């Protein structure tokens, strides 16, 4: 939240495995929605299993929002959407019957990128360029092992994430 208050539009959170990346994402969406900063959010992951896990966790912990799993229903309307990169790449080109885009550039106020360390940016980076939104990446990869292109995507100096929470802090 401090990064957002400094008018930064992107951030990378590095958290050790099992320390609550998804719970952190849920809390972030909750706070930003309650503050009316975010109306619609998109949670992206590289695998169907991660999308489904996140969808279920959000439903269980964020009672006041409506959810759309785009892997199951591409026509539903809600406040928090879940998708794989591959599915979203196809959807940003889809048109409505009236000729407008199904997902316009301003559709989402916040995009959360799970497993942000993966090499998805060369292939799916257009998603992040297309949407005009806040961008938050989550990864468990130690900060000295995160690719510098990942830091660059979030507008950060190599090796300097927005925040990190390592296993020593968790214990």
Language-model region placement:
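RecA-like P-loop NTPase motor core of helicase/translocase proteins
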Residues: 1-171
